[in-house]
């Protein structure tokens, strides 16, 4: 749950090994008293340590799964035969007196109640000890029970061992193992092995490779294919070395791991994995991993869902006892219900072997003549077991699976001083030095002294029993008084002995030894008539005077008297049952009590003032729930120093359990459950205590142990100092989930703090497929786990009718990321042979949405710095050199240091934009200045709040995107202008040449006519007029021809410029919207920074006030400190509320300003279009005059200096010279607008 030591843990777990003696086998006589049978067998163990097997009388091999073995016993702890015939055959009663040393009993079963006993007697001496120790060591091996890579090998081994009389493997055994779909099995057998149902297989022909080939035919794996495709196999049936290495480092690696302590996988290590798991030599030679090898890797030891450190003893065991959750049992002796169940000594063995470190003993007075105290459930019809047998069983098994201390929780109803003395003597003689009687020197029983640690108490047994502090003289030490019947009810928990009942009272353990108290009517059953037995006090043993009683004894005596006076005799005790009838302890039993002294709980404040860590209290679950609801933080504080025990209420007559997580959440250590009932609470308890080496002790989270920290288990926010987790679980597929052809569904639950608990995520039900169902569904998200070290994840599979298949409990803080196989367990947390689930998990630290940018910058700082540099370069192209330098410094700051508002700057004229194509919009002068002024500096909110204004259009026109667009549009217009200019100049040259030629011909024609005719002057004049008229018409045609070309070109250019204008406006709108989005994001960051700054100012103010208050007198200081804290809270709440209101108003102002910018953009567009249209129209109207001036040499005021005028001014009468001039004009004027 918590408490892993810092740094890299040195793994202490060892893999299972089978010694040669067990592999070779030994001769034993197997006897069964019920069947009156005895057979000589040879016990063997397979080389992997999976199965114990022997050949029975019918020549068939019997097997026993090693993981089902719960204990092995030899000597006097082994079962002895009672049948005279079997005893005679085994040699009992003969000369050999060492026969007991040859006996061995193997206890096996799926849970602590349903156990079987296999009895053996060794033929040879010194054989039993080796077999017993090695079998128990293999059965308890933690690595063997957490090895998914051995699942298929184990199934293969079982088939190989179960041969028939001919020494062959029956095919029916294969069909039985995979009975969920026999048709698929038969098809796979035919395709893979060529055997039919009625045949058998020679063991040497049934290799592991053939078995795996059969499984590949039996199980199609579309889930693995999909994973390979997602990794990057791209339809190929293999992964390359680089792909495998990337997959492991990116998908399978926890990003939270330190790269120095846990470096990423290197190529050489990835190659070793391929060599280990790839069965195909061709792929192996090419450093490739096939689908089969990839599936093997997913189930390999390197890819466990949990690190081995979580399974190993990795927690600090040197903290006080109160710092641990302790595996605890209630009514340990019962095997079934609370009313008529069977009591069993074996249950104490099984509970302790299961890791329980606190067992309960309900002891009652024995009957004459033996007067042997016994254990039973008082006032019910449950059976009895002798106390001595129970203590011997505890002594035998207390430290077989865990060396850490065991607590014996006595509920003492023995109202006989003689029998209590016998109880104490049994404890001393049976436990010997293991029984802790005197407190340790380092940990005296004094106020303020913490409890010793589990490490200090290794191998010790502690007694929890009512301890009566008696005066040293004046009263016989052996006196014992039973409580009167009218004091039979307790108001809060158990009586001053803090003992625990469990059920309503129906009968009596003995008609002459138990108090006649019964509240069986609470459960509707008839009360049994009993004769009340008088207490020793009524018989004349009165208390002596306490004038010589020490202060502590007097104080405790007064407390007990107070309890008796305040008890309500009429209040029913249905929940608390027999605790009220417990008797006072004698000196003999009191002497055995030290660090676990039960006292009646009064209040948390009273316990804090007493400050006695060795005192503890017990709470029935209903009273504990009341305290948990009313005072959760005080409950946590109490459990930091003292022990508390929670036990089920008495109305749970079916031995059901409450959910232990409720009380773990407040740090209760001894959360006792009914171990015989494997319901969900007990399953959770068994799963949780599997970790930390199954020691029975789990270190509580640090926040629940530190005296300087307070913890609220009902918190819904992240606790300062605790790293919350985020977890995502996707159930992909299952394998061999049931032996029936049914649908399967999977539930995923989380147990932890109330805010962390989630129930129930559930997949859909597969359609009649329990072999290999595939669930392609969305993952289950646990976005925020506030206290991951106290949270557990449960993944459970069920058949469609709700029948339990298997489950697994995983500590959230230790779950690894990636794809993993999860082998399922039964209700008692024992591993199942084949059922498994393939899941995908993502485990990470929880990061609030507001801090995602910071987290990304920390995770990938190189990428973050590169992005900042890139942004700085982009800004440098838009703003001046000095501002660029300042912006670069700003971008290189951490995200928490950046300004929240976007600063505006004056736009820099674009050198390419020497003729503006749209008028500038209304310009504002935004600033990011503080709202505070000299008159407002006293206003705390105004001094913190900064104003943010929208960026104006003029500044956004200088955006890089706009500059780039204008550059492209200018280039486009220049190209179009060049094209038109070339056509116009060429036509102008031709027209000028034609005019020059016509002019020359016109001058010569009148002279020739005069010479030839010389007749009439009038005719000559008339002819000149006609020539002049024709020349003018020629001129007009020339002008019109050039005018039509230029007007068409002007219209094309106008259309292109209008198109550019629309593009520019659209792009400007996108820039505006992007700027607004960025501004809102930065405004959100600015809000958080302003809140933090406000809180810092308030905290500083509070600290200053506290420093001043500490200088005052003590009584004034406390009052003033209280007032300072109250004022600080009020001022903080009000100030943050005012700041949030001001921030909201600022947000609204910014939104309104941004809307004005957008409206300005919308209103501006038609004006720009009209202006551009007018400008183009004016240029088009000037074209006729330009052309006439160019062609005819006319001059007129107001004519533009167009290219045609330049052509005309250079003169074209010189022919080629005119052409050269036209070319020069083109090169000189190509950048001038028409």
Swiss-Prot record:
Q: Where is the C2 domain?
A: 706-834
Organ and tissue specificity: Expressed in parotid gland, brain, liver, uterus, lung, heart, adrenal gland, and ovary. Not detected in spleen, pancreas, intestine, thymus or kidney.
> GO cellular component annotations, sorted alphabetically?
cytoplasm; cytosol; nucleus; postsynaptic cytosol; protein-containing complex; sarcolemma
Q: N-acetylalanine: which positions carry it? A: 2
Query: What spans are recorded as compositionally biased (Low complexity)?
Result: 486-513, 924-934
| Ranges of biased composition (kind: Polar residues) | 577-586, 886-907
Ranges where the PI-PLC X-box domain occurs? 315-466
For the keyword NAD, the answer is no
Q: Is Cytoplasm given among the entry's keywords? A: yes
Q: What is its EC number?
A: 3.1.4.11
Region labeled Interaction with SHANK2 — which residues?
Answer: 1231-1234
CDD domains from the xrefs?
A: C2_PLC_like, EFh_PI-PLCbeta3, PH_PLC_beta, PI-PLCc_beta
Where is the segment annotated Disordered? 465-586, 886-936, 1196-1234
List UniProt keywords, sorted A-Z: Acetylation, Calcium, Cytoplasm, Hydrolase, Lipid degradation, Lipid metabolism, Membrane, Nucleus, Phosphoprotein, Transducer
Q: Which reaction does it catalyse?
A: a 1,2-diacyl-sn-glycero-3-phospho-(1D-myo-inositol-4,5-bisphosphate) + H2O = 1D-myo-inositol 1,4,5-trisphosphate + a 1,2-diacyl-sn-glycerol + H(+); a 1,2-diacyl-sn-glycero-3-phospho-(1D-myo-inositol) + H2O = 1D-myo-inositol 1-phosphate + a 1,2-diacyl-sn-glycerol + H(+)
Subcellular localization, as worded in the UniProt entry: Cytoplasm; Membrane; Nucleus
Biased composition annotated in UniProt, kind: Acidic residues: 554-566
Q: Where is the active site?
A: 330, 377
Q: Per its UniProt record, what InterPro entries does this chain match?
A: C2_dom (IPR000008), C2_domain_sf (IPR035892), EF-hand-dom_pair (IPR011992), PI-PLC_fam (IPR001192), PLC-beta (IPR016280), PLC-beta_C (IPR014815), PLC-beta_C_sf (IPR042531), PLC-beta_PH (IPR037862)
Activation and inhibition = Activated by G(q)/G(11) G alpha proteins in response to ligand-binding to G protein-coupled receptors.
SUPFAM superfamilies with a match to the protein in the record: C-terminal domain of PLC-beta, C2 domain (Calcium/lipid-binding domain, CaLB), EF-hand, PH domain-like, PLC-like phosphodiesterases
Superkingdom: Eukaryota
Q: Please give the subunit comment from the record.
A: Interacts with LPAR2. Interacts with SHANK2.
Query: What name goes with this protein?
Result: 1-phosphatidylinositol 4,5-bisphosphate phosphodiesterase beta-3
Give the originating organism: Rattus norvegicus (Rat)
Q: What is the lineage of its organism?
A: Eukaryota, Metazoa, Chordata, Craniata, Vertebrata
């Amino acid at each position: 749950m918590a408490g892993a030591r810092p740094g890299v843990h040195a793994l202490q777990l060892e893999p299972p090994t089978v010694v040669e003696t067990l592999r070779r086998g030994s001769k034993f006589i197997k006897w069964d008293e019920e069947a009156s049978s005895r057979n000589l067998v040879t016990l063997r163990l397979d080389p992997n340590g999976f199965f114990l097997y022997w050949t029975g009388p019918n020549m068939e091999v019997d097997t026993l799964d090693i993981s089902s073995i719960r204990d092995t016993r030899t000597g006097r702890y082994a079962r002895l035969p009672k049948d005279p015939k079997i005893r005679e055959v085994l040699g009992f009663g003969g000369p050999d007196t060492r026969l007991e040393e040859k006996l061995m009993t193997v206890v096996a079963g799926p849970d602590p109640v349903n156990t079987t006993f296999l009895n053996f007697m060794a033929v040879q001496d010194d054989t039993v000890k080796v077999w017993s120790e090695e079998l128990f060591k293999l059965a308890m091996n933690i690595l063997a029970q957490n090895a998914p890579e051995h699942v298929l090998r184990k199934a293969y081994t079982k088939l190989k061992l179960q041969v028939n009389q001919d020494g062959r493997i029956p095919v029916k055994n294969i069909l039985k193992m995979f009975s969920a779909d026999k048709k698929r099995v038969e098809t796979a057998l035919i395709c893979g092995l060529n055997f039919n149902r009625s045949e058998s297989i020679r063991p040497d022909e049934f290799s592991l490779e053939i078995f795996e080939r059969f499984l590949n035919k039996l199980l199609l794996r579309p889930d693995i294919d999909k994973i390979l495709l997602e990794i990057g196999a791209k339809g190929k049936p293999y992964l390359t070395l680089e792909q495998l290495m990337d997959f492991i480092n990116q998908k399978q690696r926890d990003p939270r791991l330190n790269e120095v302590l846990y470096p990423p996988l290197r190529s050489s290590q990835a190659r070793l994995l391929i060599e280990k798991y790839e069965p195909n030599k061709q792929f192996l030679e090419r450093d490739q991993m096939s689908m089969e090898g990839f599936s093997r890797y997913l189930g390999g030891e390197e890819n466990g869902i949990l690190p081995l450190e979580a399974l190993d003893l990795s927690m600090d065991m040197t903290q006080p006892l109160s710092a641990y959750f302790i595996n605890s049992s209630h009514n340990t002796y019962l095997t079934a219900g609370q009313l008529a169940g069977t009591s069993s000594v074996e249950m104490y063995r099984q509970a302790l072997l299961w890791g329980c470190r606190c067992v309960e003993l309900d002891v009652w007075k024995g009957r004459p003549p033996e007067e042997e105290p016994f254990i039973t459930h008082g006032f019910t019809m449950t059976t009895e077991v002798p106390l001595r047998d129970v203590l011997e069983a505890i002594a035998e098994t207390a430290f077989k699976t865990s060396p850490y201390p065991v607590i014996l929780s006595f509920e003492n109803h023995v109202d006989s001083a003689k029998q209590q003395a016998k109880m104490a003597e049994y404890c001393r003689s049976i436990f010997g030095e293991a029984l802790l009687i005197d407190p340790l020197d380092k940990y005296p029983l004094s106020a303020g002294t913490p409890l010793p640690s589990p490490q200090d108490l290794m191998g010790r047994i502690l007694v929890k029993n009512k301890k009566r502090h008696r005066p040293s003289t004046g009263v016989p030490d052996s006196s014992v008084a039973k409580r009167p019947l009218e004091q039979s009810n307790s108001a809060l928990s158990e009586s001053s002995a803090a003992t625990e009942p469990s059920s309503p009272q129906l009968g009596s353990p003995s008609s002459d030894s138990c108090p006649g108290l019964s509240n069986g009517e609470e459960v509707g059953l008839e009360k049994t008539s009993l004769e009340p037995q008088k207490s020793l006090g009524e018989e004349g043993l009165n208390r002596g005077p306490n004038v010589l009683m020490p202060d502590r004894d007097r104080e405790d005596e007064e407390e007990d008297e107070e309890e008796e006076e305040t008890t309500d005799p009429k209040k029913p005790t249905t929940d608390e049952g027999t605790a009220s009838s417990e008797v006072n302890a004698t000196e003999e039993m009191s002497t055995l009590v030290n660090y676990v002294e039960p006292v009646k709980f009064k209040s948390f404040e009273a316990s804090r003032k007493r400050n006695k860590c060795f005192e503890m209290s017990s709470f029935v679950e209903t009273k504990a729930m009341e305290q948990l609801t009313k005072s959760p933080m005080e409950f946590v504080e109490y459990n930091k120093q003292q022990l508390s025990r929670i036990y089920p209420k008495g109305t749970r007559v079916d031995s059901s359990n409450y959910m232990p997580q409720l009380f773990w959440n407040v740090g209760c250590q001894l959360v006792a459950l009914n171990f015989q009932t494997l319901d969900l609470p007990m399953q959770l308890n068994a799963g949780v205590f599997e970790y930390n080496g199954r020691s029975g002790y789990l270190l509580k989270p640090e926040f629940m142990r530190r005296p300087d920290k307070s913890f609220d288990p009902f918190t819904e926010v992240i606790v300062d100092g605790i790293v919350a987790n985020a977890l995502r679980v996707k159930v992909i597929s299952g394998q061999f989930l049931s032996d029936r052809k049914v649908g399967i569904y999977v539930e995923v639950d989380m147990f932890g703090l109330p805010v962390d608990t989630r129930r129930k995520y559930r997949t859909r039900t597969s359609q009649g497929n329990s072999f290999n169902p595939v669930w392609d569904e969305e993952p289950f998200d646990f976005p925020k786990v506030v206290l991951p070290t106290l949270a557990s994840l449960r993944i459970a599979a069920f058949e469609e009718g709700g029948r339990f298949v298997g489950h697994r409990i995983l500590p959230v803080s230790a779950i690894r990321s990636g794809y993993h196989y999860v082998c399922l367990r039964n209700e008692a947390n024992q591993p199942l042979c084949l059922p498994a689930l393939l899941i995908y998990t993502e485990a990470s630290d929880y990061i609030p949405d507001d801090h995602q940018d910071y987290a990304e910058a920390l995770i990938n700082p190189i990428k973050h710095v590169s992005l900042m540099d890139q942004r700085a370069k982009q800004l440098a192209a838009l703003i001046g050199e000095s501002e660029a330098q300042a912006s670069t410094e700003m971008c290189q700051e951490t995200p928490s240091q950046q300004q929240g508002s976007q600063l505006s700057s004056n736009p820099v004229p674009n050198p390419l934009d020497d003729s503006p194509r749209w008028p500038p919009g209304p310009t504002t002068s935004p600033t990011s200045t503080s709202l505070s002024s000299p008159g407002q500096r006293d206003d705390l909110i105004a001094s913190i709040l900064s104003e943010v204004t929208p960026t104006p259009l003029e500044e956004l026109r200088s955006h890089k995107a706009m500059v780039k667009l204008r550059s492209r549009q200018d280039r486009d217009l220049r190209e179009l202008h060049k094209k038109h200019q070339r056509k116009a100049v060429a036509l102008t040259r031709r027209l000028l040449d034609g005019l020059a030629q016509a002019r020359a011909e016109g001058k010569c024609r009148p002279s020739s006519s005069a010479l030839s005719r010389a007749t009439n002057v009038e005719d000559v004049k008339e002819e000149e007029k006609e020539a002049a008229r024709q020349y003018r018409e020629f001129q007009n045609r020339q002008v019109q021809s050039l005018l039509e070309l230029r007007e068409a070109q002007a219209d094309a250019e106008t259309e292109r410029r209008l198109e550019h204008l629309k593009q520019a406006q659209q792009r400007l709108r996108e820039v505006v919207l992007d700027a607004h989005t960025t501004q809102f994001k930065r405004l959100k960051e600015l809000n958080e920074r302003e809140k933090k700054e406000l809180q810092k100012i308030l905290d500083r103010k509070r600290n200053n006030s506290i420093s001043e208050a500490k200088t005052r007198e003590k009584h004034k200081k406390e009052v003033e400190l209280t007032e300072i804290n109250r004022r600080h809270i009020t001022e903080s709440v009000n100030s943050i509320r005012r700041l949030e209101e001001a921030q909201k108003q600022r947000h609204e102002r910014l939104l309104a300003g941004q809307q004005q910018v957008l409206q300005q953009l919308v209103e501006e567009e038609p004006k720009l279009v009209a202006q551009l249209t007018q400008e183009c129209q004016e240029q088009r109207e000037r074209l006729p005059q330009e052309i006439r001036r160019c062609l005819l040499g006319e001059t007129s005021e107001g004519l533009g200096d167009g290219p045609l005028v330049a052509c005309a001014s250079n003169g074209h009468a010189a022919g080629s010279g005119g052409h050269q001039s036209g070319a020069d004009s083109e090169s000189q004027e190509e950048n001038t607008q028409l």
